[in-house]
Amino acid sequence: MESKVEQGVKNLNMENDHQEKEEKEEKPQDASKRDPIVALPFEAGDYYVPRGGRRRFRVRQPIVHYRWDLMHRVGEPQGRMREENVQRFGDDVRQLMEKLRERQLSHSLRAVSTDPPHHDHHDEFCLMP
């Protein structure tokens, strides 16, 4: 009798173990069987931004970067803002701003005008006969 009872207990334990194993195997499958993300419908005029880890890229302005670099390139921290350093720093920033302004103007002028700069067209727009 005891052997039948022991066999029954063993069978129950084996069935429970088997069920637990099946449940553990089903959990990862459920994660992989998830429905794909469907775009939310939106009406005309509405703007939908998906939530999540969005990175915002900040464009650095070159002048600001140059100023920071120049400030930290100066010698020892005690002498960082002595008069000669301040004057040199101002001169460097002024030169960099002039270079940047020239480059920006050259690009904008190139985009606006296709005619060579030596032509003078002021008489073409004269309304006098």
From Swiss-Prot:
Coarsely, its chief localization is cytoplasm
Q: Which GO terms describe its molecular function?
A: metal ion binding; molecular function inhibitor activity
The free-text tissue note of the record is: Primarily localized to neuronal cells within several regions of the brain, including the olfactory epithelium, bulb, peri/paraventricular nuclei, suprachiasmatic nucleus, arcuate nucleus, median eminence, lateral hypothalamic area, thalamus, hippocampus and cerebellum (at protein level).
Q: Where on the chain is Omega-N-methylarginine found, per UniProt?
A: 51
Task: Quote any Pfam family the record assigns.
Answer: BEX
What does the entry list as the binding residues for Zn(2+)?
Answer: 126
Region described as His cluster: 118-122
Bias-annotated ranges (Basic and acidic residues): 15-36
Free-text domain note: The histidine cluster (His cluster) and Cys-126 mediate zinc-binding.
- Name of the protein in question: Protein BEX2
Which gene produces this protein?
Bex2
